[in-house]
Amino acid sequence: MVAVSLKKIFFKQKTAYEIVHAVSAFLLNRSSDLDAHHVFQLLTGTAGTIRLNHLWQSPFTMHSNLVEHIRTEARNARAGKRARIIAKMNALLEPTIIEELYKASRSGVKIDLIVRGVCALRPGVPGMSENISVRSIVGRFLEHHRVYYFHAGGDDVLYLSSADWMDRNLFRRVEVAFPVLDRTLKARVIKEGLQVHLRDNASAWIMQSDGEYVRKPSRAKEQRVSQVELLGRFGT
């Protein structure tokens, strides 16, 4: 058994007050144990490159796995099946990933990207990215988790990771993405790690096709602020 943890951090600079929300998974199978073992062997220099069973690892397999999952959604969309990608990260710059997302959008995949910082992708461009939305949520607290979701024909593939979709993270660092396999936990991560941010109608800035961000006033009576919701659940 191996426990893999990814921390979600809320940090208020003025008061130096930190709230840490740990997103963790206990991987209860032999192949996952071996995956973690091989990662630590690599870090200590006692093993070479080994293809892992469940974990994605930079700089070896993470990029190719991301590309393949994006392409799978595109194939499903072209076949008339439901296709969906939701991803949350701090930065999106890697050219191949961006091009694959454009191709997936042209194939009909609905893509929602929650990118806190720099994003080189342009959503809503006619003939290229009409099916892509990009939002940035910059509130009082720093959020540091990355979540990748692929509909995968109804299998709901979900990974938690340390890696932004940038060249440095995917090719020049050792980073890991691990799957959430339990259906109950998977549904909870989708709800608390992704959907809560997509529902945010008060602090989200929406990227336009020219790269400008617009904060549209909400017409809803209820103001939904994702960080307030999360603090209500996990804060003190």
Predicted regions and their residues:
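Mobile "lid/hinge" segments at catalytic clefts and subdomain interfaces of large enzymes
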Residues: R30-G45
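PLD/PLD-like phosphodiesterase catalytic module centered on the HKD motif
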Residues: A47-R51, P59-T236
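Internal, active-site/partner-interface "lid" segment
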Residues: D33, L55-W56
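Short, small-residue-biased leader/transition segments that mark boundaries at the very start
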Residues: V2-V4, T15-S31
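Non-catalytic alpha-helical coupling and interface elements of nucleotide-dependent molecular machines
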Residues: S5, Q41-G45, R199
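Polybasic, lysine-rich low-complexity intrinsically disordered segments
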Residues: K8-I9, K14
